[in-house]
């Protein structure tokens, strides 16, 4: 666990991290305490000048996270993140590339997060296709994962790898090539800290292809998971139960899970919301005892039916706290992944999610509404805090009635 300890020793501030990430968290905590926003780069938030800083020497602080793996998913990036990156800081690759990912990874550490699902729309170059990206994951000690199976980025990588489109992305008809596709990524990633998504869906966020009827789909997924576990064993060496894995029962996959799909006990069940920030299903008492634990994939942005919301972030801290506190109380403590869309519209709400992931008791549902004022005060100063908080609270109230896109 990436924890840190701070204390004074002979008039020196000592920060000890349980891991390199823990040390980074401790250093960035000092930065936070003296008024530096985690978004100092992303939002140009300049800290207020301080002529003097004081540090009390009468206490030792130890901090550790409530949730083990916590991070963000860049998604639906075509209209903002992608064109911005390729026209500004990543002109060399003309895509979301290492300069963008370096800033995202620093932001994750500043927010005490540790996990990244990189952008994966069809026009976004796959994270693992650039050596510079991979070096960043090591440099910043970020745990890499993906919403696509086995660390792949299907929309960018599958056609380039296979020469086929969605028609070839069926384990029922093309198991040998798909197995090779997954195995090559597992081998490539063996020296990196990573969490593997197991199971399978079709391309373009659709159901599994090539299996007619629920019974056939269950049998097919069972074969798929067995093949993936063998890849993990062969490519990473040793016991697959020691390699972090998640299964995400998203959309139709939840129906299949509830119909009896068996997931190995060491795999984290990453439950889902309904795309609008309300959790669909909580783990049972038996599921909470799984050795792999439980997690949540949560949306602050969504592109799809019946209603998209990517222009403005509309999920209030009160709703987030109610749902994620409920998740935590029901055993979802291993993995929290937040879909932030292009990030910019959801910066404040994502910061709130990571505040909860670090200390789930910091913003309980009954006081979460005060986060807007706390955020406004630390970002813009006390003179503007009340007015800005009122504006944000009214925004959340109106957005709860109707999304801006509608």
Model-derived features: where do they sit?
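Conserved, mostly hydrophobic/aromatic
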Residues: 19, 72, 112, 269, ...
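Active-site clefts of carbohydrate-active enzymes
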Residues: 156, 204-210, 291-317
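Gly/Pro-rich turn-and-neighbor structural signature
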Residues: 46-48, 52-55, 128, 134-139, ...
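C-terminal non-catalytic alpha-helical accessory regions
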Residues: 49-50, 372-406
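Contiguous, structured surface segment used for ligand recognition
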Residues: 1-64
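Catalytic or ion-translocation cores adjacent to nucleophile or general acid/base/metal-coordination motifs
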Residues: 127-165, 169, 178-182, 321-329, ...
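An acidic-aromatic substrate-binding cleft motif
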Residues: 37-93, 99-119, 292-295
């Amino acid at each position: 666990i990436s924890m840190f300890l701070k204390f004074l020793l002979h008039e020196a501030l000592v920060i000890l991290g349980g891991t390199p990430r823990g040390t980074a968290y401790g250093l960035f905590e000092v930065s936070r305490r003296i008024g530096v926003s985690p978004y100092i780069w992303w939002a140009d938030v300049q800290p207020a000048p301080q002529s003097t800083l004081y540090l009390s020497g009468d206490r030792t602080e130890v901090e550790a996270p409530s949730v083990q793996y916590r991070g963000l998913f860049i998604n639906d990036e075509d209209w903002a993140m992608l064109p911005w990156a390729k026209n500004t800081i990543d002109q060399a690759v003309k895509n979301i590339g290492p300069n963008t990912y370096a800033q995202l990874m620093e932001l994750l550490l500043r927010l005490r997060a540790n996990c990244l699902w990189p952008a994966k729309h069809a026009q976004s170059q796959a994270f693992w296709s650039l050596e510079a990206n991979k070096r960043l994951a090591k440099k910043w000690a970020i745990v890499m994962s993906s919403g696509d199976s086995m660390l792949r980025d299907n929309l960018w990588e599958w056609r380039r790898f296979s020469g086929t489109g969605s028609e070839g992305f069926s384990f029922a008809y093309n198991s040998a090539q798909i197995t090779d596709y997954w195995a090559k990524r597992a081998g490539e990633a063996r020296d990196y800290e990573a969490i593997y998504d197991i199971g399978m869906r079709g391309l373009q966020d659709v159901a599994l292809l090539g299996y007619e009827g629920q019974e056939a789909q269950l049998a097919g997924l069972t074969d798929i998971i067995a093949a993936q576990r063998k890849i993990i064993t062969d490519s990473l060496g040793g016991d697959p139960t020691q390699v972090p894995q998640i299964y995400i029962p998203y959309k139709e996959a939840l129906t299949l899970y509830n119909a009896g799909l068996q997931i190995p006990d060491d795999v984290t069940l990453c439950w889902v919301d309904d795309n609008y920030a309300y959790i669909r299903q909580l783990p049972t008492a038996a599921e909470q005892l799984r050795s792999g634990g439980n997690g949540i994939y949560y949306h602050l942005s969504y592109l799809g039916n019946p209603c998209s919301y990517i222009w403005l972030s509309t999920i209030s801290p009160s709703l987030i706290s109610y749902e994620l506190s409920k998740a935590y109380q029901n055993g979802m403590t291993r993995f929290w992944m937040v879909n932030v869309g292009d990030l910019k519209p959801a910066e404040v709400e994502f910061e709130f999610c990571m505040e909860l992931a670090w200390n789930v008791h910091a913003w309980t549902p009954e006081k979460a509404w005060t986060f807007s004022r706390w955020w406004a005060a630390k970002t813009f100063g006390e003179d503007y805090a009340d007015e800005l908080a009122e504006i944000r609270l009214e925004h959340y109230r109106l957005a709860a009635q109707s999304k801006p896109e509608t």
